[in-house]
């Protein structure tokens, strides 16, 4: 069956797209309508406004959902299960405690930042905060320093790991939309995340922690050792590295003088879904069964870890519908040449789209979905090298992280846990998130020079 082609009047299409995006923002910001419904309404407005046949609009909606989820649904689910076991087993706590021991109190910010970065690649940001923030409070209590001095590096690491390094949902989503294999995304994402954590966590955390003294939360005295024996550091780190190593080996094996059979095996084992399946099974055995968890307990942990996944996938799918509606209506072929003539780097355009949506809507996932979807409709983007598109992924993820303020749930989560007012949260957390975005943009532009 031949795919329906459609050519809209350029002016009509531009107006329809503008109206659709404005309606999307108004529905979310003004009327507080759920992003999933808002994006579906916006997509239909764009298609109908552009004059697309009704049958084509419905076909595009179905195609948008299918094509968007086919490369990411399983990865997000597996990654969530993997992170759930890591969290409940005490693996995240072990990483933090060991690094704090090695670095010492004077460099505890580094230890917490690196812990956040490692854990942020595998667990949702909110879960990472709940599990690890007591450790930041513990160090602050011992040193009598501002809680911001230790909390900001930890939060920066969590945010950077989640934004840039697979198998986190955000990085996988953007890489999938722009056709970047996860091995390349990992190789670009890790140094980007490290630099962002250094600038926004260590440097900014030290500055703001010395400038603003924040007391320990009132209930910090209630945080006690629950007596649970934690898994060893080497075991936890080894399990965390399984998916990263397998995916990287798959990518690098193509450039190694290896027998064809070995390359095929490495390529197969490094398929993201299989690498994460192996990692999840390893986590279940080494961090679960061998440490006394029953099958029923593990099932309960996995079920609980999957609760947030459905909503995230619905948001991603709805954003994918807008992306395909824009693509099938021909918008990419219109704005692509216009943007090329503007002389602006494509990476800069991608960053600005992401940061505008993030500041307007508040959701980083919506911003990532929208920005990557819009950029993917432009033929000029898909003609660039894999490395360039990986750098663009980091710019998008950075833009979608920046400018967290009162319309972002993360803003209130951090303020509540640290027991600080909105003004202090803006001065510390919001600037930290924005520094992550700006630093990621600079790193992405530098990488693009060599792409």
Where do the model's predicted regions map?
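Juxtamembrane and boundary regions of transmembrane helices in multi-pass small-molecule transporters
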Residues: 145, 180-228, 398-451
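Hydrophobic core segments of alpha-helical transmembrane domains in multi-pass membrane transport
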Residues: 16-28, 40-49, 76-81, 116-120, ...
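Short helix-coil transition sites and intra-membrane helix breaks within transmembrane domains
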Residues: 30-35, 69-73, 83-93, 119-133, ...
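Hydrophobic transmembrane alpha-helices that form the pore/transport pathway of multi-pass ion
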Residues: 100-188, 360-398
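Long, contiguous bundles of hydrophobic transmembrane helices that form the permeation core
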Residues: 2-11, 187-300
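Juxtamembrane helix-boundary/capping and inter-helix hinge elements in multi-pass membrane proteins
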Residues: 50, 87-92, 102-106, 139-150, ...
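Membrane-interfacial loop-to-helix junctions in multi-pass transporters
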Residues: 11-15, 54, 66-72, 99-114, ...
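Core transmembrane alpha-helical segments of multi-pass membrane transporters/permeases
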Residues: 37-40, 44, 60-93, 268-330
């Amino acid at each position: 069956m031949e795919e329906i082609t459609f050519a809209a009047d350029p002016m009509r299409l531009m107006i329809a797209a503008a109206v659709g995006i404005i309606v999307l923002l108004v529905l979310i910001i003004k009327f507080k309508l759920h992003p999933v419904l808002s994006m579906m309404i916006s997509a239909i407005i764009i298609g109908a406004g552009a004059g697309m046949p009704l049958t084509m609009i419905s076909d595009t909606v179905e195609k948008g959902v299918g094509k968007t989820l086919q490369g990411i649904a399983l990865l997000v689910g597996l990654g969530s299960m993997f992170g759930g076991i890591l969290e409940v087993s005490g693996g995240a706590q072990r990483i933090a405690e060991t690094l704090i021991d090695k670095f010492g109190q004077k460099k505890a910010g580094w230890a917490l930042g690196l812990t956040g970065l490692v854990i942020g690649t595998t667990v949702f940001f909110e879960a990472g905060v709940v599990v690890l923030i007591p450790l930041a409070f513990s160090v602050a209590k011992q040193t009598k320093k501002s809680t911001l001095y230790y909390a900001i590096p930890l939060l920066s690491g969590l945010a950077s790991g989640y934004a840039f390094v697979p198998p986190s949902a955000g990085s996988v989503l953007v890489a999938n939309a722009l056709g970047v294999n996860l091995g390349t995304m990992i190789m670009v994402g890790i140094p980007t995340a490290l630099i962002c954590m250094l600038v926004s966590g260590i440097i900014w955390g030290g500055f703001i922690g010395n400038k603003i003294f924040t007391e320990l939360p009132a209930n910090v005295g209630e945080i006690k050792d629950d007596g649970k024996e934690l898994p060893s550091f080497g075991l936890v780190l080894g399990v965390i590295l399984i998916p990263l190593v397998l995916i990287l080996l798959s990518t690098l094996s193509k450039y190694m003088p290896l027998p064809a059979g070995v390359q095929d095996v490495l390529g197969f084992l490094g398929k993201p879904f299989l690498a994460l399946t192996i990692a999840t099974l390893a986590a279940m055995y080494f961090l679960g069964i061998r440490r006394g968890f029953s099958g029923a307990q593990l099932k309960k942990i996995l079920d609980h870890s999957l609760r947030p996944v459905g909503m995230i996938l619905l948001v991603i799918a709805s954003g994918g519908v807008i992306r395909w509606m824009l693509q099938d209506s021909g918008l990419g072929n219109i704005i692509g040449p216009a943007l090329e003539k503007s002389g602006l780097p494509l990476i800069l355009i991608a960053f600005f789209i992401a940061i505008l949506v993030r500041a307007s809507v508040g959701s980083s996932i919506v911003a990532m979905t929208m920005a990557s979807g819009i950029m993917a409709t432009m033929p000029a983007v898909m003609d660039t090298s894999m490395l360039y598109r990986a750098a663009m992924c980091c710019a998008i993820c950075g833009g979608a992280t920046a400018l967290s303020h009162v319309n972002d749930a993360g803003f209130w989560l951090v303020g509540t846990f640290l027991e600080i007012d909105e003004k202090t949260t803006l001065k510390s957390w919001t600037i930290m998130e924005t520094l992550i975005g700006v630093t990621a943009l600079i790193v992405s532009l530098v990488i693009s020079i060599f792409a």
